[in-house]
Amino acid sequence: MALRERIRIRLKAYDHRILDQSTTEIVDTAKRTGATVAGPIPLPTSRSITTVLRSPHVDKKSREQFEIRTHKRLLDILEPTQQTVDALMKLDLPAGVDVEIKAFGK
């Protein structure tokens, strides 16, 4: 009997390689414990641009732009077992990955 109907996991990171590595680790763990996985679904990458002056005093026209991209992935774990939940709790992911977990029941 399933503990919950569905677990939704959203992953965010600045580096897409670490994000994909974490995603495959979660998918492998869920499949190994007998759960069905939908995804990973790549969500749109958000891009933030910051413009600063190059000089502290003069040259207002001389500016520099910095960009940071936030990559996102979505995973749905359908019909998770108790083993799946325990394995996901013990999973050690890299420090640069933000994980949001939501559980949906009946």
UniProtKB/Swiss-Prot annotation:
The keyword Ribosomal protein applies. SMART domains: Ribosomal_S10. One of its GO terms (cellular component) is ribosome. Signal peptide: none annotated. InterPro entries: Ribosomal_uS10 (IPR001848), Ribosomal_uS10_CS (IPR018268), Ribosomal_uS10_dom (IPR027486), Ribosomal_uS10_dom_sf (IPR036838). GO terms for molecular function: structural constituent of ribosome; tRNA binding. GO terms for biological process: translation. It comes from the Bacteria. The keyword Ribosomal protein applies. Keywords: Ribonucleoprotein, Ribosomal protein. Part of the 30S ribosomal subunit. Involved in the binding of tRNA to the ribosomes. Belongs to the universal ribosomal protein uS10 family. NCBIfam families: PRK00596.1, rpsJ_bact. This is Small ribosomal subunit protein uS10. It comes from Solibacter usitatus (strain Ellin6076). The gene is rpsJ.
